[in-house]
Amino acid sequence: MGWKSHGFRFKSGRKLRKKVREKGVRIRKFLQTFDVGQRVHIDIEPASQKGMPHPRFQGRTGVVIGQRGRAYLVQVRDGGKMKTLIVRPEHLKPQSG
């Protein structure tokens, strides 16, 4: 008997699920740009695994502190610590207001 894998997406099926009408990826999500200092929400796009942050950061808000290739460096508070995530633009949403 083997051991069950506890990988990156383990127990995240409900968190990464999309409703039927939301399925598919819009091209504008891949092409959106952000400025340094802009506040963004982490909204994971399950159809794209590249540059995906860990599911524990789903729904968190952070600040863009730089860019690395096509991805952005986003600083997020996790408990009492600040963490830097490397996230591609399809997993980010600008904060409105």
Curated annotation (Swiss-Prot):
A Gene Ontology biological process term: translation
SUPFAM superfamilies documented for this protein: Translation proteins SH3-like domain
Keywords: Ribonucleoprotein, Ribosomal protein
Listed GO CC annotations: ribonucleoprotein complex; ribosome
Family to which the UniProt record says this protein belongs: Belongs to the eukaryotic ribosomal protein eL21 family.
PANTHER family attached to this UniProt entry: 60S RIBOSOMAL PROTEIN L21
Protein name: Large ribosomal subunit protein eL21
Record organism: Archaeoglobus fulgidus (strain ATCC 49558 / DSM 4304 / JCM 9628 / NBRC 100126 / VC-16)
